[in-house]
């Protein structure tokens, strides 16, 4: 191809070329040449059209610059070269396109016959053949040691031939492409190095086999080998470096391809879809949950203890039996140091009544039996509770219906007379007739009177007096609880020497005190032991219900002035049902005085809304008191009438006077709730007093073994202290509004 034909032919020229690959396949290529549009004059557009099997015709455009003879594969590269002079990465000259790799990736070379010189190719092939002949001749010469001289000549001839070939090739390749020079030079140098290695082997063999050769020959051979050694080593190093660099480049390219593939491949984020096994998760157990709820350092609350124990002992679907509930309450509900709250009082009934080491009394045994009979899921209604408790406390019928026997610590003189307080005037006569019975009759019916007292006493609120219950089941079957007529519940500072007498707890109470007239009748002085002998009233003289046939007998320890004063008071208040003592702090434990104290204390305490709310909360029902009048706006009249027992305020002129009128109505329906220990504890919590009265059975059992004379003297002193204190205690100022709140029936 000449530059003249390209410049002259502006019209499209079409030629057909046949290109041969290395594998012998031939491709038919149509080449069209025309003037390039959009480029300076002289630029040629070359279009190669090829037909591929299974493909469409392929058109490859090339743009050729006639001056620089550069070939550009796209119009964009050609225009950039015209404007800026930048050749780019894909530009090549016209002669470089004679031998190029096919873009199909088959590694096939295409020879363009128009540009290949046949003579140069034939020369290269002939040279290669000569080199192969030389190698073969060398191998043959090594087989025999006799031909050593010939081999030396052959090596010299081989060196001469190779030098001549290299000179001829250098002259011819100056005209041709420099790329072909490099290829041929590489081939020749490789063959030359191989020949040099064979020469070294030959030299070694010569030394071993022919030791009788001439020194001249050895010197000539050694000199030739020494002269060629540095050249050979330099060539070997260069080839090794090139090979290593080529290998490194190929390895780096392969690694880059792998990284690209690994990054471009989509990965699964789900372990389930990827087939990765999940880590086993721990199973949550109920015990572990319960242990997390319970605090580690602090003592668990009673409610939490009960829940955890029930969950571990009883199956989750079954309800725990009442027996199990009772055990858990006794063992775990009450904390060791803190006082249980009001919410837990209902649950800890059995625990507060019973010490863990004491034995159950008959009353508590009956209560536990009732709890076991009733199903655990249904809660006992207040009506059912009242029925069960009343049945436990009513004594067997002894033929004396209609009378409520008070636990009277009767005065036992030489005749050991027994006195009882009837409920009304109609029964008083029968009571007086039966009062002449023998002392053993009183002892026989002591248990009945104790149970009757508990039935009547439940309607009155008061503080129990005494010590712990007795453990003797033979002498006492049910506890005897005696209440005070004292809404304030303070007994400190009133005990005297005679209080520690084991005969009767009724005598162990306060004596007359030195009081100042302050608001609400607060006591400010201590008791005077001399006052015990000056003011005392016998129950037979105080009560207007006593039979007149009995007469007024002076007490052995009473003085004349005290007897006259008591007689005067009995005459003044015989026609009225008003008894003084409103807001009195303490009543003596005499049987006659406490019989009226029950009703008055109940009426006073029921007016307190806190106690009323506690009763309603614990029992589920409100306490409805019969014959309880409504409370008026007058604070003095609010304390005058209460459930059959009325009080009148005491004036300063009426000091040291005492009289009482005993009226005992039938017990109300809600009276049984007052014997509940939880209600007793609630009253103790609300009023701030200490419960007393649990030691009554113990002292009662002890008093039965004492002599009658000692009991008579102690009871006489108790009655004196009782009446004297009531007369000394005044109502206070008119503005005192103690317990003035009304308690409604709902």
Swiss-Prot record:
Alphabetized UniProt keyword annotations: DNA-binding, Nucleus, Repeat, Transcription, Transcription regulation
Any Gene Ontology CC annotation: nucleus
Residue ranges with Polar residues bias: 190-199, 427-451, 529-546, 702-730
Major subcellular site: nucleus
The keyword Mitochondrion is assigned to this record: no
Compartment list: Nucleus
Motif range (Nuclear localization signal): 13-20, 44-51, 256-263
Compositionally biased spans, kind Basic and acidic residues: 169-180, 244-260, 732-746
MF-aspect GO terms: methyl-CpG binding
Domain MBD per the UniProt entry, residue ranges: 29-104
Gene3D superfamilies documented for this protein: Methyl-cpg-binding Protein 2, Chain A
PROSITE patterns per UniProt: MBD
Lineage top rank: taxon: Eukaryota
Compositionally biased residues, Basic residues: 465-476
Region feature Disordered, mapped onto this chain: 131-157, 169-283, 295-328, 348-479, 518-562, 696-746
Residue ranges of coiled coil: none
The protein's role, per its UniProt record: Probable transcriptional regulator.
Domain comment, as recorded: The methyl-CpG-binding domain (MBD) functions both in binding to methylated DNA and in protein interactions.
UniProt name for this protein: Methyl-CpG-binding domain-containing protein 13
């Amino acid at each position: 191809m000449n530059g003249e034909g390209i410049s002259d032919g502006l019209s499209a020229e079409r030629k057909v070329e046949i290109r041969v690959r290395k594998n012998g396949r031939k491709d038919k290529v149509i080449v069209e040449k025309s003037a390039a549009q959009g480029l300076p004059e002289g630029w040629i557009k070359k279009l190669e059209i090829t037909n591929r099997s299974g493909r469409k015709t392929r058109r490859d455009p090339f743009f050729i610059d006639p001056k620089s003879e550069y070939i550009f594969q796209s119009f964009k590269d050609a225009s950039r070269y015209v404007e800026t002079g930048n050749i780019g990465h894909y530009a090549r000259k016209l002669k470089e396109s004679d031998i190029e790799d096919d873009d199909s990736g088959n590694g096939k070379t295409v020879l363009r016959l128009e540009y290949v010189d046949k003579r140069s190719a034939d020369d290269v092939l002939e040279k290669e053949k000569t080199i192969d002949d030389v190698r073969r001749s060398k191998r043959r010469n090594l087989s025999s040691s006799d031909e050593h001289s010939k081999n030396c000549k052959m090596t010299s001839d081989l060196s001469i031939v190779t030098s001549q070939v290299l000179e001829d090739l250098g002259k011819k390749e100056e005209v041709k492409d420099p790329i072909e020079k490099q290829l041929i030079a590489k081939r020749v140098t490789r063959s030359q190095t191989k020949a040099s290695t064979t020469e070294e082997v030959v030299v070694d063999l010569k030394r071993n086999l022919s030791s009788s050769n001439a020194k001249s020959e050895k010197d000539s051979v050694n000199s030739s080998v020494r002269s060629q050694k540095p050249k050979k080593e330099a060539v070997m190093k260069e080839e090794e470096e090139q090979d290593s660099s080529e290998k490194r480049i190929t390895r780096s390219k392969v690694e880059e391809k792998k990284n690209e593939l690994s990054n471009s491949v989509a990965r699964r984020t789900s372990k389930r879809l990827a087939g990765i096994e999940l880590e086993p998760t721990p199973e949550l157990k109920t015990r572990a949950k319960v242990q997390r709820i319970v605090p580690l350092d602090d003592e668990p609350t009673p409610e939490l203890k009960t829940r955890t124990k029930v969950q571990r002992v009883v199956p989750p679907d079954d309800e725990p039996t009442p027996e199990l509930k009772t055990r858990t309450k006794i063992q775990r509900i009450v904390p060791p140091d803190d006082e249980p709250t009001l919410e837990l009082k209902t649950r800890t009934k059995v625990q507060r009544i019973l010490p863990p080491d004491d034995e159950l009394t008959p009353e508590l045994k009956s209560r536990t039996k009732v709890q076991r009979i009733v199903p655990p899921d249904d809660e006992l209604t207040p009506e059912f509770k009242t029925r069960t408790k009343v049945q436990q406390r009513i004594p067997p019928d002894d033929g004396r219906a209609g009378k409520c026997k008070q636990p009277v610590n009767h005065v036992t003189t030489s005749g050991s007379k027994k006195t009882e307080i009837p409920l009304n005037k109609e029964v008083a006569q029968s009571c007086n007739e039966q009062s002449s019975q023998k002392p053993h009759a009183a002892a026989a019916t002591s248990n009945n009177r104790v149970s009757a007292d508990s039935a009547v006493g439940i309607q009155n609120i008061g503080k129990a007096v005494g010590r712990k219950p007795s453990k003797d089941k033979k002498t006492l079957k049910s506890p005897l609880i005696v209440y005070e007529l004292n809404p304030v519940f303070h007994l400190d500072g009133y005990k005297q020497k005679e209080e520690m007498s084991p005969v009767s707890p009724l005598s162990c109470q306060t004596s007359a005190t030195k009081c100042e007239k302050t608001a609400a009748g607060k006591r400010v002085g201590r008791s005077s032991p001399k006052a015990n002998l000056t003011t005392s009233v016998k129950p037979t003289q105080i009560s207007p219900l006593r039979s007149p046939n009995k007469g007024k007998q002076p007490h052995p320890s009473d003085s004349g002035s005290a007897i006259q004063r008591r007689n005067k008071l009995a005459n003044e208040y015989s026609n009225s049902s008003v008894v003084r003592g409103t807001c009195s702090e303490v009543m003596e434990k005499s049987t006659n005085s406490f019989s009226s104290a029950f009703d008055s204390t109940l009426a006073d305490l029921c007016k307190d809304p806190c106690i009323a709310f506690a009763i309603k909360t614990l029992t589920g029902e409100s306490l409805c008191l019969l014959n309880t009048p409504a409370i008026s706006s007058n604070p003095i009249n609010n304390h005058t009438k209460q459930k059959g027992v009325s009080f009148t305020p005491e004036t300063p002129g009426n000091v040291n006077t005492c009289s009482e009128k005993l009226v005992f109505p039938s017990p109300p329906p809600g009276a049984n709730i007052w014997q509940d220990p939880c209600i007793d504890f609630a009253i103790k919590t609300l009023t701030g007093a200490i419960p007393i009265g649990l030691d009554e059975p113990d002292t009662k059992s002890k008093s039965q073994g004492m002599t009658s004379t000692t009991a008579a003297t102690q009871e006489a002193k108790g009655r004196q202290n009782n009446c004297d204190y009531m007369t000394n205690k005044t109502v206070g100022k008119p503005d005192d509004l103690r317990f003035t709140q009304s308690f409604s029936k709902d």
